[in-house]
């Protein structure tokens, strides 16, 4: 965390190195990537170990060399999170390792809690089946966007769903609506043929209904 001039407005800038975890929480075995539990998750530690083992030699070589983050206490924090001591040089920054109290594995839960706002509820997740969305959600999308249907209506990746449904979207004008393992509904549409403002309006008007269901995010994904 970099802190601004406190004599000015007392603001703090919270900089998040996303997806670089330093160790799994005690309940990691309750969360999965496919069929694999998150037990033993430690992205940063595994990267450092791969570098030390000579398994990360493309474009670089040797042990992980991150002097600025190391000085701030990155290696100390990783060791603490995994019940080890760190014998390297003392850190010049203030460091620590925190255990999340929010149940969500998603981005908003983690970021909100880092900013001091834990999430004491369970997010809503759409099932990994087709159709993924209940009829009332599909109906709301169609009414707001003034369309007669939606495309995808399933769990999908961003690039794959555009490849699969992009041509049909351009031809039929129906928005591409999909979700993932996160608490999210993503809507992709062409910013000219569908309209950027129309897409943003759709997501903005749809969001209150989905937030009432405890869905974390409604994301607009315009494409060219």
Where are these regions (language model features)?
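Short, well-ordered beta-to-alpha junction loops that form the rim of enzyme active sites
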Residues: 178-182, 220-223
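Generic enzyme active-site microenvironment
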Residues: 16
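Extreme N-terminal starter segment of soluble prokaryotic enzymes
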Residues: 8-13
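Active-site nucleophile/metal-coordination loop of metallo-enzymes that catalyze phosphate/sulfate
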Residues: 21-173, 184-190
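Eukaryotic N-terminal low-complexity, Ser/Thr- and Lys/Arg-rich leader segments
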Residues: 1-4
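Extended, H/D-rich, highly charged conserved domains that either
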Residues: 189-192, 196-224
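Phosphate-/polyanion-interacting regions in eukaryotic proteins
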Residues: 170, 179-181, 192-196
